[in-house]
A protein has these predicted regions:
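Positively charged n-region of N-terminal signal peptides that target proteins for export
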Residues: 1-6
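Generic detector of short alpha-helix boundary/capping microenvironments
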Residues: 7-8, 72
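Hydrophobic helical h-region of N-terminal Sec-dependent signal peptides
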Residues: 8-17
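Surface-exposed, beta-sheet-biased, low-hydrophobicity segments with strongly acidic/polar composition
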Residues: 20-168
Length: 168
């Protein structure tokens, strides 16, 4: 009887350990901060949005890191936010992010998690897709070469790094 209890305890401990390892506490912290930012916060920053590209090069010029949050305005005049979960980890050429696009009343229009945005692709925040056609594109990951890269909002889309979004 004691042996069965010991084995059951060992199995329970192993299952709990595996469960804890499967969750990334850093990503959860990024998401918690991301979801603490509401539509009013995004709307307040909307006057500062710009069409300037954001440097994500593989050097000291990089302006973004994991956990950073961007606020955006789409070409369909919707505000939104995105959180960077992983940016070019191990030089993968991939950006992993979550995003929320709001309608004009501040209600969630579209929301997706764990979006994998590859280098040289474009993304549409109004539809939550990587469009086949360039028309209506919202954000482009522009790779000049293996080092120099930018996130480029295509006008009239605008972007802004959320202030004090550092989580690292």
């Amino acid at each position: 009887m004691e042996m069965k209890r010991t084995i059951a305890t060992a199995i329970l401990v192993a299952v709990l350990a595996i469960s804890c390892l499967s969750r990334n506490p850093t990503i959860e912290a990024y998401r918690n901060h991301f979801y603490s930012i509401n539509f009013m916060d995004v709307e307040t920053l909307s006057v500062k949005l710009t069409t300037e590209q954001i440097d994500i090069s593989r050097n000291e010029k990089r302006m973004l890191k994991d956990g950073d949050i961007l606020v955006y305005l789409t070409d369909e005049d919707r505000l939104g936010k995105m959180v960077i979960l992983e940016l070019d980890k191990n030089e993968s050429g991939m950006l992993l992010f979550d995003f929320v696009t709001y309608d004009k009343d501040g209600k969630v229009f579209i929301e997706k998690k764990d979006v994998k945005f590859n280098s040289s692709y474009v993304f549409d925040f109004d539809k939550g897709i990587f469009p086949k056609e360039i028309e209506g594109v919202k954000l482009w990951w522009h790779s000049i070469d293996d080092i120099e890269m930018y996130l480029v909002p295509w006008a009239p889309t605008k972007l802004l790094k959320y202030p004090n979004a550092e989580m690292n």
